[in-house]
């Protein structure tokens, strides 16, 4: 069965991709959940138009992402959190906490889903946090976690 994906499907593809799947998978899972539509000639032409517009937008987004990466490059962010005597935090620092601290430090607004915490931040100290702004642009933010 030939389908056009309307949403990101792990292991299958991204929106706009034309994929070949088993009939049951397409009919019983992808189409009812609106992850995909049937691949007709009209739908394929529409997808091609959308892909052309998306590629033009990607060029603009790349420039914007590089601009934001430049702003984040020299930014030092302090995060105040409650901690015990040994420096262990009560809870852990989340991506939303990092975004809030970056905004408070005068940095640009970020999407919390773009912030990657490789290891959970559960103690005081200095950390480097990666921010994926674009598939080709990743910025790093220096984060200092201090005791409240």
Swiss-Prot record:
Stretches assigned to coiled coil: none
Q: Specify whether Ribosomal protein is a keyword of the entry.
A: yes
Q: Which GO terms describe its molecular function?
A: rRNA binding; structural constituent of ribosome
Tell me one GO biological process term: translation
Q: Which Pfam families does the protein's record reference?
A: Ribosomal_L9_C, Ribosomal_L9_N
Keywords, A to Z, come to: Ribonucleoprotein, Ribosomal protein, RNA-binding, rRNA-binding
Name the domain of life.
Bacteria
Under the cellular component aspect of Gene Ontology, which terms does the record hold?
Answer: ribonucleoprotein complex; ribosome
Checking PANTHER family in the record gives: 50S RIBOSOMAL PROTEIN L9
Task: Name the family the entry cites.
Answer: Belongs to the bacterial ribosomal protein bL9 family.
Q: What does this protein do?
A: Binds to the 23S rRNA.
Looking up NCBIfam families in the UniProt record yields:
L9
**Name by which UniProt lists this protein:** Large ribosomal subunit protein bL9
Q: What is the scientific name of the source organism?
A: Frankia alni (strain DSM 45986 / CECT 9034 / ACN14a)
């Amino acid at each position: 069965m030939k389908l056009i994906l309307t949403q990101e499907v792990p292991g299958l593809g991204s929106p706009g991709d034309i994929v070949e799947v088993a009939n049951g998978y397409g009919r019983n899972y992808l189409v009812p959940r609106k992850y995909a539509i049937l691949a007709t000639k009209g739908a394929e032409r529409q997808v091609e138009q959308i892909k052309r517009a998306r590629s033009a937008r990607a060029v603009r987004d790349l420039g914007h992402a590089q601009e934001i990466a430049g702003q984040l490059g020299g930014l030092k962010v302090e995060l105040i959190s409650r901690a015990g005597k040994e420096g262990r935090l009560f809870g852990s620092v989340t991506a939303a906490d990092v975004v809030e601290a970056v905004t408070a430090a005068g940095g640009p607004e970020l999407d919390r889903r773009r912030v990657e915490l490789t290891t959970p931040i559960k103690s005081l100290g200095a950390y480097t946090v990666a921010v994926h702004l674009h598939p080709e642009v990743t910025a790093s933010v220096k984060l200092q976690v201090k005791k409240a």
